[in-house]
């Protein structure tokens, strides 16, 4: 079995481009903004791609404090958190409990909306793909707090580094409101650095214009 190498943003960007996870062009977002790039982590749907993403989360978590439990919000976060637990064990020799939530509560069997490791009295890191408006993260934070957990922080794959409705980005709003750290594996700046290194002048110019208009 090949041991995954350490996560590098450029390698992840190249893999994301090859899988169609990351695209440069013209895309209308739910907010109505026309973005020069699009990121869909749901297309990280093979072993190699998921392994590299999980390695990134695992590497980042080893630099974080208070990692009692890692948690993946339903549904997209579930494979991410499971793969991250494996990566932590295989490459960092850390056996970290993990869990996730259901969208609908069960009234039989183990019941409830939480599945996996117990979170009561634990410091929990949430693992997800992106924070767009912050609505989903706020919902899962409420669920975890109601179960007696302390939220230690959030890890996401991409920080778009753009303003929400106000002057802050969605990530900055979550950090300020919930008083927790939010870390990202790659940022919009990483994407721009990649385009510059590859000599992709048109795509880079589009990114620069977008960042000047909406960036933080």
Curated annotation (Swiss-Prot):
GO terms for biological process: 'de novo' pyrimidine nucleobase biosynthetic process; 'de novo' UMP biosynthetic process; pyrimidine ribonucleoside biosynthetic process. 5-phospho-alpha-D-ribose 1-diphosphate binds at residues 30, 75-76, 102-103, 106, 108, 128-136. It is an enzyme of class 2 (transferase). Its cofactor is Mg(2+). InterPro entries: OPRT, Or_phspho_trans_dom, PRibTrfase_dom, PRTase-like. This is Orotate phosphoribosyltransferase. Pathway: Pyrimidine metabolism; UMP biosynthesis via de novo pathway; UMP from orotate: step 1/2. Pfam families: Pribosyltran. Orotate binds at residues 38-39, 132, 160. It comes from Acinetobacter baumannii (strain ACICU). It catalyses: orotidine 5'-phosphate + diphosphate = orotate + 5-phospho-alpha-D-ribose 1-diphosphate. Its EC number is 2.4.2.10. Homodimer. Belongs to the purine/pyrimidine phosphoribosyltransferase family. PyrE subfamily. Keywords: Glycosyltransferase, Magnesium, Pyrimidine biosynthesis, Transferase. GO terms for molecular function: magnesium ion binding; orotate phosphoribosyltransferase activity. NCBIfam families: pyrE. PANTHER family: OROTATE PHOSPHORIBOSYLTRANSFERASE 1-RELATED (PTHR46683:SF1). GO terms for cellular component: cytoplasm. It comes from the Bacteria. Catalyzes the transfer of a ribosyl phosphate group from 5-phosphoribose 1-diphosphate to orotate, leading to the formation of orotidine monophosphate (OMP).
């Amino acid at each position: 079995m090949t041991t995954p190498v350490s996560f590098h943003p450029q390698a992840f960007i190249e893999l994301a481009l090859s899988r169609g996870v990351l695209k440069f062009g013209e895309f209308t977002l739910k907010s109505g903004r026309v973005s020069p790039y699009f990121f869909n982590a749901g297309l990280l749907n093979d072993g190699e791609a998921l392994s590299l993403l999980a390695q990134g989360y695992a590497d980042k978590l080893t630099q974080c404090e208070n990692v009692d439990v890692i948690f993946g919000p339903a549904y997209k976060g579930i494979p991410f958190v499971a793969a991250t637990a494996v990566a932590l064990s295989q490459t960092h020799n850390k056996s970290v409990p993990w869990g996730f939530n259901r969208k609908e509560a069960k009234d039989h069997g183990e019941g409830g909306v939480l599945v996996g490791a117990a979170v009561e009295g634990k410091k929990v890191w949430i693992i997800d793909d992106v924070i767009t408006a912050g609505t989903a993260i706020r919902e899962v934070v409420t669920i975890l707090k109601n179960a007696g957990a302390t939220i230690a922080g959030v890890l996401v794959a991409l920080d778009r580094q753009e303003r929400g409705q106000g002057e802050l980005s969605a990530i900055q709003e979550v950090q300020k409101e919930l008083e927790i750290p939010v870390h990202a594996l790659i940022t919009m700046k990483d994407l721009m650095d990649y385009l510059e290194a590859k000599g992709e002048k048109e795509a880079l110019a589009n990114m620069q214009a977008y960042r000047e208009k909406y960036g933080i």
